[in-house]
């Protein structure tokens, strides 16, 4: 039983959610101001994808495991505090970048710093909240994704339009420093495995390279060699690959297709990619915890059903003739798709013991960062570039799109027909590239469906082995 009151645990989860909100905000701000950066620094969409995905994700993934292993032994609160101060400061420094190379380097630094957030946070939450409520608690934490996106979209869109993209980075970075100090003062380091069976809280032996390698192999085996868990991990990775690419370029699509300014696009992104997504995350976690009282299969079925329903809405968002219909469809697609996150994270935390949770989360975030975030925006940006070039060539243009429309805009003094050809080709290329990414959402749904077979047996086996406690009723005061 946890020694902390339900009220204090709620405060802890909310403070960790605030940290993840700034994590998401500092990551998302690039996609919101991407058109302004593209025009200012004369970049291609593939370079934008590199900035928003690969540069950040490569270092995020490489830094995740060492920091996670440190979090299994050292204070997770201290790790989060230092990491939050570092990535917030580096985000603000993006305003000083004068070239693509400089901005790329700073974003790589942000990636290293942000690697200290979620492994520590997931481990902390799992030591404050019992297994029967973890999907719900982790859903609240994961809402930081949508909250950060809302702030990035609303604030970044407004500042990009009225003060420039550089000021947007400053505004996104600085508040995180204050949040880090509050977390350091308010959040206590909980006992490892305090809400789990005794075997889950076993102490680690003294540090040795051999032991660390053995621990990494054990966690990897838990995620890879158990078929239902592997399907959950594959589904999460494929869905994130699609989502990172899709949501990175959807603000640009609204500007290109409907000729909207940064401010309105920011508000649309905040509502459709933030509020609706956040509600979906919360509902998915709470619903799966509730239905899992009868069958643990619902931890996979809720994402599978929600993902299936989301697909036609994502397609409709890209073929709707007006921005209002597109925004409404985008909101519904995000609501149903993102119901998958809480159940997936909750299941993973429940199949490893207390001294391996940060490491398990780090493995997940390697998939989410190096594969999904690292390649998703880059892939979608590359596909958009290819579709745009082919659309522009089909219009009968004598020169390539990049030569005629540097930065996506016709050269100064170009004829009206050339300006319209540039705009039309870019809008059509964006639509086709984003439609292609929806196919990866469908692929992920298939893995969630497959995960539902055998998930009952998997989770029951871990409960009997002492990796988790059985029912909510066996732990007093564990309600969020």
Positions of predicted regions on the chain:
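Structural signature of the two symmetry-related core transmembrane helices
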Residues: 78-92, 299-314
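Helix-breaking motifs and short loop linkers at transmembrane-helix boundaries and internal kinks
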Residues: 42, 75, 96-102, 130, ...
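Extracytoplasmic gate region of multi-pass secondary transporters
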Residues: 30-31, 226-277, 281-282, 337-345, ...
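Juxtamembrane intracellular "pre-TM" segments in multi-pass secondary transporters
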Residues: 2-5, 194-232, 257
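Central cavity-lining transmembrane alpha-helices of secondary-active solute carriers
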Residues: 53-69, 271-284
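Conserved MFS/SLC helix-loop-helix module at the cytosolic interface between two early adjacent transmembrane helices
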Residues: 62-101
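Helix-loop-helix hairpin linking two adjacent transmembrane segments in secondary transporters
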Residues: 141-192
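Cytoplasmic helix-loop-helix junction between adjacent transmembrane helices
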Residues: 106-147
């Amino acid at each position: 039983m946890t020694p902390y009151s339900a009220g204090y645990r709620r405060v802890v989860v909310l403070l960790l959610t605030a940290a993840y909100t700034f994590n998401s905000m500092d990551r998302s701000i690039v996609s919101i101001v991407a058109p302004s950066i593209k025009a200012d620094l004369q970049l291609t969409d593939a370079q934008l994808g590199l900035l928003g995905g690969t540069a950040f994700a490569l270092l995020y993934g490489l830094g995740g495991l060492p920091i996670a292993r440190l979090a299994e032994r050292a204070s997770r609160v201290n790790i989060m505090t230092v990491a939050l101060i570092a990535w917030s400061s580096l985000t603000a420094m993006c305003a000083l970048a004068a070239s693509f190379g400089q901005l790329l380097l700073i974003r790589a630094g942000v990636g290293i710093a942000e690697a200290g957030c979620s492994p520590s946070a997931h481990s902390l939450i799992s030591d404050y909240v019992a297994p029967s409520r973890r999907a719900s608690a982790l859903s609240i934490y994961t809402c930081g994704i949508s909250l950060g996106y809302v702030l990035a979209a609303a604030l970044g869109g407004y500042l990009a339009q009225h003060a420039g993209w550089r000021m947007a980075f400053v505004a996104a970075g600085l508040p995180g420093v204050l949040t880090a100090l509050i977390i350091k003062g308010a959040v206590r380091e909980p006992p490892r495995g305090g809400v789990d069976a005794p075997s889950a809280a076993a102490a680690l032996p003294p540090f040795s390279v051999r032991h660390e390698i053995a621990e990494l192999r054990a966690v990897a085996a838990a995620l890879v060699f158990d078929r239902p868990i592997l399907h959950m991990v594959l589904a999460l990775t494929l869905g994130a690959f699609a989502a990172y690419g899709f949501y990175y370029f959807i603000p640009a699509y609204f500007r290109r297709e409907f000729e909207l300014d940064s401010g309105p696009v920011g508000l649309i992104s905040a509502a459709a990619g933030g509020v609706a997504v956040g509600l979906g995350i919360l509902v998915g976690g709470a619903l799966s915890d509730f239905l899992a009282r009868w069958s643990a299969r619902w931890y996979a079925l809720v994402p599978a059903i929600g993902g299936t329903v989301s697909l036609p809405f994502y397609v409709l968002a890209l073929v709707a003739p007006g921005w209002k219909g597109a925004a409404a469809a985008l909101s519904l697609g995000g609501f149903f798709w993102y119901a998958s996150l809480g159940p997936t994270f909750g299941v993973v935390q429940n199949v490893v013991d207390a001294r391996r949770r940060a490491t398990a989360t780090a493995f997940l975030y390697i998939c989410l960062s190096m594969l999904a975030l690292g390649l998703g925006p880059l892939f979608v940006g590359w596909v958009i570039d290819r579709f745009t070039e082919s659309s522009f060539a089909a219009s009968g243009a004598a020169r390539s799109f990049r030569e005629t429309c540097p930065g996506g805009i016709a050269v100064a003094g170009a004829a009206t027909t050339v300006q319209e050809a540039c705009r039309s080709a870019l809008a059509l290329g964006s639509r086709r590239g984003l439609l292609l990414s929806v196919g990866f959402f469908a692929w992920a749904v298939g893995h969630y469906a497959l995960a539902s077979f055998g998930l009952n047996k998997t989770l029951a086996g871990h409960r009997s082995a002492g990796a988790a406690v059985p029912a909510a009723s066996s732990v007093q005061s564990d309600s969020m």
